[in-house]
Amino acid sequence: MFFINFKKIKKKQFPIYLTQHRIITVFLIFIYFINLKDCFHINNSRILSDVDKHRGLYYNIPKCNVCHKCSICTHENGEAQNVIPMVAIPSKRKHIQDINKEREENKYPLHIFEEKDIYNNKDNVVKKEDIYKLRKKKKQKKNCLNFLEKDTMFLSPSHDKETFHINHMNKIKDEKYKQEYEEEKEIYDNTNTSQEKNETNNEQNLNINLINNDKVTLPLQQLEDSQYVGYIQIGTPPQTIRPIFDTGSTNIWIVSTKCKDETCLKVHRYNHKLSSSFKYYEPHTNLDIMFGTGIIQGVIGVETFKIGPFEIKNQSFGLVKREKASDNKSNVFERINFEGIVGLAFPEMLSTGKSTLYENLMSSYKLQHNEFSIYIGKDSKYSALIFGGVDKNFFEGDIYMFPVVKEYYWEIHFDGLYIDHQKFCCGVNSIVYDLKKKDQENNKLFFTRKYFRKNKFKTHLRKYLLKKIKHQKKQKHSNHKKKKLNKKKNYLIFDSGTSFNSVPKDEIEYFFRVVPSKKCDDSNIDQVVSSYPNLTYVINKMPFTLTPSQYLVRKNDMCKPAFMEIEVSSEYGHAYILGNATFMRYYYTVYRRGNNNNSSYVGIAKAVHTEENEKYLSSLHNKINNL
């Protein structure tokens, strides 16, 4: 029922409508939706609900092609013109969710004579898959490993970009280096390269352009449960190299025969002297790149690259000629036998030449969709890199696209990381804030009777008062910081060159206090895993959850969260990193380049792992091996 009151204000009557509270509420909600008709809206009470269950009920998101500067949109699901599947060789390390499968296999251990049968088969051919199966069945579960340990984890160069040094040498002053430079221009001595030439001739016959239904495939292989590498060809005649495809960096690095270090000698190296299309970049430029575990030194060259059906000429890249380990740390390539890096991040990060490989590829071939996507198989064996669109077989539901905040990393804004239903960081009522406050309270000094001795009372009283004043100052400083924390934004960086997810340095201690490592063996592993919380990344109020079995790893009868400490420069905000094995394994990711003042986007969808996908990618891998 409506009531109408009239008031005389400056001799004018203004009707003021007063209604029941329910009608007012409905009216305000209606006005709110009118104002947000072109925007995304979500019921905040469902912020940590299962995204698949509530997606259709609580989301009204436009397509990206009709959306301009939206905080979120959905992918148009354009099919890819070029699909590059990645196939990984399974390693001895296993994920928590695969342990049950291993238990069944270990019930039937193989014996020595069975191992001999593998090597003495009629065709006299040794299959890597057979050897792996044999070793896996003989492996004891207590030695079951998953990914690399934190201290030996390979970090992509993106995490230490501020530490690299570029030394332009327009004039070569070092006589020793000048002599080496002149020698490299001479014709290569055939007597010392007969074996390498034979290998090159065989690789020239390798055709990795498997085109089927407008989809091009290039298998990738997994190394140490950490990195995914694929086959590319370099030079004329082509030499086959297996680099990492890294969304966390932009430069191309190839291990060359110029490198005589032990870690270089154990992998296949590119020989620039065998290629007629190779030339040095002008002006002659040396590069020193510092990683988390060492330094790579090299020189910039120009060469012809072939990735699947794409041939990119005059592409600048870095030739690795030396690897130096940091103090008390292992060498960059010591644990992982990759032969190079192909960066897929933005040009602003480039230090090897003028244009990136992806820019040259897109400008040369004019693909329908200026994007690529990554699919990581559930068991880390079968994976795929897709250029020019997406493959609907690898995901389900919509792909939710989020704008890149700064075109350097593939970096987006996100609301925060939640451990179960509590925000981890930052701001009031977050886990980090509560733990820091608790630590401050525990550090207070309290009087005890031992301090009340007559001869020491004044001294200890003075010390106590000084400590108390100092503590009060800290509290004021903490309250001042609290206001800053509320304004601090959180960011996510998508990095396919890193395996584990990361937490900033100042928060990693608190993270492991809430999600600690626990002892687990075959008798209690299910109980231990179920005791861990869910971890949820909330992006524009949309939750993307990792269950304990998805983010835990097992090593030496210990269950550990697959997280590590990586500190990103403050220039790029309060940033967390999502890696290939802990996040991308369960979520299909899309990377779209912006143009004409349109933002770049990162897309996320729930990954689908089926036997059909494995068979499809496995068949492509077998075709590559048989060529």
Curated annotation (Swiss-Prot):
Membrane spanning residue stretches: 14-34
GO molecular function: aspartic-type endopeptidase activity
Domain Peptidase A1: 228-605
CDD domains assigned: pepsin_like
GO biological process: entry into host cell by a symbiont-containing vacuole; protein autoprocessing; protein processing; proteolysis
Nucleus as UniProt keyword: no
E.C. designation(s): 3.4.23.-
PTM entry text: Autocleaved into a p55 mature form.
Lumenal face residues: 35-627
Pfam families: Asp
Keyword Transmembrane helix: yes
Residues exposed to the Cytoplasmic side: 1-13
Activity modulation notes: Inhibited by small molecule 49c. Inhibited by small molecule WM382.
Effect of a null allele: Normal asexual development in host erythrocytes. Egress from erythrocytes is normal; however, subsequent erythrocyte invasion by newly released merozoites is severely impaired. Accumulation of RAP1 p86 precursor resulting from impaired processing. Impaired ASP processing. Impaired secretion of CyRPA during merozoite egress from erythrocytes.
Places the protein is found: Membrane; Cytoplasmic vesicle, Secretory vesicle, Rhoptry
Keywords: Aspartyl protease, Cytoplasmic vesicle, Hydrolase, Membrane, Protease, Signal-anchor, Transmembrane, Transmembrane helix, Zymogen
Family recorded in the similarity comment: Belongs to the peptidase A1 family.
Entry protein name: Plasmepsin IX
